[in-house]
Design a protein with these regions (language model features):
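Beta-strand-rich domains and repeat architectures in extracellular enzymes and scaffolds
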Residues: 47-51, 196-228, 257-261
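A short beta-strand motif characteristic of beta-propeller blades
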Residues: 192-199, 241-252, 294-301, 343-349, ...
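Repeated scaffold domains used in trafficking and secretory/extracellular systems
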Residues: 201-208, 253-262, 303-312, 352-359, ...
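Structural motif
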Residues: 225-231, 279-285, 329-336, 375-381, ...
């Protein structure tokens, strides 16, 4: 396994003598030499050709192409000369070597591709060269990115000696000898969100949940007036709806306009809270025997005026439900599970037209963040003696925040703050307050959703007036970098769902089809 050898500095004419036979190198060939070539019995040297010369005999053992005008070697370029033992390209415009370019050259021992324009070599270009003794690629402007990783791997496993020259980019390896690169120098695994399935309806929210060992998803359909529950269909390999709330046999209230449905499993029972702008908000219970949902209770009929968002959580063993109320005279209300239903526990933040509520823990303390259209986001913390949330602080310099989503990274708590126009922000909790980390431009944004998929961390900023932006966290800089665009019309929610070792991202669209993307892994060196 060498990257240099006894032939590395050997003069080319010596190799030609060894391959062609020194005593017979001037003997006239028995075949007609192409007009652009000079030929002996076993050798051909061709100058300024526009391609691999045709008409060469199959028993030629040495071929040299100098100052050629063609730019690529295609598959099977030398099938007519299977006896070649030495092949040379030099001082030409050759820039691309495709897969299987040298197929059929079972006897080739010396391959010189020097001082050309080659920036990369296809992964299977050298396939079939089992007898190769020496490879020389010096003098080429190699771009040492993932497309060249295979060559570094090949060098570590071959017995052939090699001279490869130096990298001409990218920046971090510019000027490095290609022979000094190692596999760990390449980061060639990336990811993408690929469209997997479209659902023919508009949606506002997407809520994944676990029930009986399977993951499901609840989707709010405002124009259809219902909440649909979807599961993975193992036979069709796609998601399908298996139940609906506010659908036949239950009549749809006129103008009900559901805005959120929140599934939760309480005491082993599946409940779904359906918040509506009209017709009342209700709690529904799944009945296994009948395979449908039945209405359990109306939720706070005297308290909820214009619900906009829901959050469910557990504190000190109790289940709570928070309903953000966006009416001018309303108040965000906290309900507690009492065994047979949810009952009002605390009123928060009256008269501020709250648009979103997020539950999180700050330094181990249960907390709520309320986003409002009339003031900065407010942080509440749980008081155990009073069994209530008390105002703790607000988030500075962030008026008109529509929604708040949080995530944890390396022990720190971050929030994604959504603004419709201007800049949405990522902020980090630093003991007593949130501080800026990063700004992202919003173009009609109503959702800024952090997503954790495997070891990858993303943040998706939905835009009504441009493409939605997927950002991926870069551990080296500690920032999110723009990664991909999604063409989802008027997105209102993004959610991650894992099914049988496959990861999906649901994108709820308010004006078009709701879309499901599959998270895929791509090897850029393949």
């Amino acid at each position: 396994m060498g990257r240099g050898g006894p032939w590395a500095c050997a003069p080319l004419f010596v190799l030609l003598l060894l391959v062609g036979g020194g005593g017979e190198r001037h003997r006239a060939p028995r075949w007609k030499c192409p007009i652009v070539c000079s030929c002996t019995q076993d050798n051909a040297l061709c100058d300024r050709t526009d391609g691999v010369p045709r008409g060469l005999p199959p028993d030629i053992t040495s071929l040299s192409l100098v100052r050629s005008g063609f730019t690529e070697l295609r598959e099977g370029s030398f099938l007519q000369t299977p006896s070649l033992q030495l092949l040379l390209f030099t001082s030409s415009t050759l820039g691309l070597i495709r897969d299987d370019a040298f197929v059929g050259l079972l006897h080739l021992e010396y391959l010189f591709i020097e001082n050309n324009k080659v920036g990369s070599v296809s992964k299977n270009a050298l396939r079939g060269l089992k007898g190769l003794v020496h490879l020389d690629l010096r003098g080429n402007p190699f771009h040492c990115d993932c497309r060249i990783k295979w060559l570094v791997e090949w060098l570590s496993s071959t017995n052939a000696s090699a001279e490869l020259g130096e990298c001409q980019g990218p920046g971090e390896v510019n000027g490095t000898q290609l022979s000094q690169l190692h596999l760990q120098d390449f980061d060639c695994i990336t990811t993408a969100l690929a469209l997997f399935q479209s659902l023919p309806f508009q949606a506002l929210s997407v809520e994944p949940f676990w029930y009986q060992g399977e993951q499901h998803v609840a989707i709010t359909q405002p124009f259809a007036g219902r909440c649909s529950l979807l599961e993975w269909d193992h036979l069709d390999g796609a998601f399908r709806a298996y139940a609906s709330i506010n659908a036949p046999p239950h009549p749809v209230p006129t103008g009900s306009s559901p805005v959120a449905c929140k599934p939760l499993v309480v005491e082993g029972r599946l409940l779904v809270v359906l918040a509506q702008l009209a017709g009342g908000s209700h709690v529904w219970r799944w009945e296994e025997a009948s395979g449908r949902f039945v209405r359990l209770q109306e939720l706070g009929p005297q308290r909820i005026r214009k619900p906009n968002a829901l959050a469910s959580f557990r504190v000190d063993g109790d289940w709570f439900l928070a309903v953000a109320d966006s009416s001018k005279a309303g108040a965000t209300t906290l309900f507690r599970w009492g065994g047979r239903g949810f009952y009002a526990h605390q009123a928060l933040h009256a008269w501020h037209r709250d648009t979103h509520v997020e539950f999180l823990e700050l330094a181990g303390q249960p907390s709520l963040i309320l986003a409002s259209s009339s003031q900065r986001p407010v942080v509440y913390q749980w008081s155990r003696p009073g069994r209530a949330f008390l105002r703790h602080t607000d988030i500075p310099d962030m008026d008109d925040v529509y929604a708040v989503k949080h995530f944890r990274l390396r022990g720190d708590v971050y929030v994604c703050l959504t603004r419709f126009i201007g800049d949405s922000k990522v902020m980090r909790w630093e003991g007593s307050m949130f501080r800026d980390v990063q700004h992202m431009p919003s173009r009609g944004s109503m959702v800024f959703q952090p997503l954790g998929i495997g070891s990858h961390r993303y943040a998706v900023l939905g835009n009504d007036y441009s493409f939605s932006q997927v950002y991926r966290y870069d551990a080296r800089s500690g920032l999110f970098v723009r990664f991909q665009e999604l063409n989802t019309q008027a997105p209102r929610s993004f959610a991650h769902l894992a099914v049988h070792q496959r990861d999906f991202v649901f994108a709820a669209s308010f004006k078009g089809d709701t879309q499901i993307y599959r998270h895929i892994t791509i090897d850029l060196s393949a």
